[in-house]
Amino acid sequence: MRDPVTGFVYPAAWVEKVSDPAGLEKVRGGSAVLTSSGTVLLRGYTTGTTAAAACKAAILSLAGDISRVTIQLPCGLSADLPVKARAGHASCRKYAGDYPSDVTAGIEFIADAAVAQKGILLVPGPGIGHFVRDTPRYKKREPAISTAPLACILSSMEEALGATGLSGATVTLSIPEGRTIADQTLNPRIGIEGGISVLGSTGLVEPWDDHLEDSVIARVAGATDPVITTGRVGLRYARLLFPDREVVLAGGKIKGALAAAKGEVTLCGLPALILKYIEPHILDKTGYATVEELAASPSFPSVALPILVAYKKKHPRVRVVLVNREGTVIAESP
C-alpha cells in the first residue's frame, strides 16, 4: 500500500496490524496515515484548504444554501468539507485531524461573496496576516497567503463561478480569531502582523504526534543510507536528487531520525529547519529575522558554509544538502 500524498510504501507488517478496515481505506485514500504499530491517524486540513472551502461555498451560496463543498487539493487529491453558506455568506472551521498541537484547530474562516461584472477577485480581510517588510518571496504589505493555497483558493472560486453561471464574483475572506491566534504562532517573529498565514503546500496537515514519530523512526531505521527531509518542498527535490534512495519526511523530528539512521545519511531540504537544528543561533548578529531571508542574501555562503563544515567534522557520516524553493542546491557539506 502506497501513501498517495508522500509516495511512501507502507510495509506489509504495518498493514497487517490494522484492526479497522474503514481506517485502512482512509489510509489508502490519503486522508490518514499508518504508523508502525498499526494505528491509523487522520490528516487534517490546512488553513489554505479551509479558506478555499469558505470562498467556494460563498460563491455557490449566491444560488442557494450550501452545506458541503469539494476542494481539489494541491497534492492532487480531493477533499469534502462541511460548510455553512447562505446568500453569499459562508463559514468553514479548520479541521486539525489527529494533530492535538495545532493552534489553529477549529478556527473559523468567513467568506462574503458579491456578484461582479466579470472574473474573480479575492480580497484579504481582517485576521489574515500581512508582511511588514520585503522578503525573498513577498513584498511589504502583501497578505500572508502562500502560492499553493492561493492557487487552490482561486481555482475553487473559478469552479464555483462556473457552477453558478455567474460572470464574476468578489470574495472577502476574513478570520475573526486570526489576530489573536497569530500571537501563538511564529508570525510576529518572522515579520507578519495582523493575523495568521494561509498556508499548505499539499492542502493537508500531517498528524505529527508521538505515534507518527515512532513510524518516522521506523522508516529511517529500516532504510539503507536514507535521505531525511523536513518538508514537502524538500521531499519533492530530494526524490529528484536521490532517486535511488529511500527519502523519509521527518518534519521537525530531525534529531530522532538521524539517531535511528544507518549507514551514510543525507539531510536534504530547505535551509530554515535544517540550519536552525544544526546551529540554533545562526541568526544572531546577522540582522535577519528568518533563515529564509538570510539564505537569499549575499552573506549566506559565508555564514552557512562554516556551520556545515563544523557539523561534518562532528558527524562525518551525515551529508547536508540545502536547496531553495526552485530546487537549486544552495549549500552542501564538503
From Swiss-Prot:
SUPFAM superfamilies: CbiD-like (SSF111342)
Stated family: Belongs to the CbiD family.
A GO BP annotation: methylation
Family matches, as InterPro entries: CbiD, CbiD_sf
Lineage, highest ranks first: Archaea, Methanobacteriati, Methanobacteriota, Stenosarchaea group, Methanomicrobia
Name of the protein described by the UniProt record: Cobalt-precorrin-5B C(1)-methyltransferase
Pfam family, one: CbiD
Organism for this UniProt entry: Methanoregula boonei (strain DSM 21154 / JCM 14090 / 6A8)
Keyword annotations of the record: Cobalamin biosynthesis, Methyltransferase, S-adenosyl-L-methionine, Transferase
EC assignment: 2.1.1.195
Pathway the protein contributes to: Cofactor biosynthesis; adenosylcobalamin biosynthesis; cob(II)yrinate a,c-diamide from sirohydrochlorin (anaerobic route): step 6/10
Keyword S-adenosyl-L-methionine set for record: yes
Signal peptide: none
GO molecular function: cobalt-precorrin-5B C1-methyltransferase activity
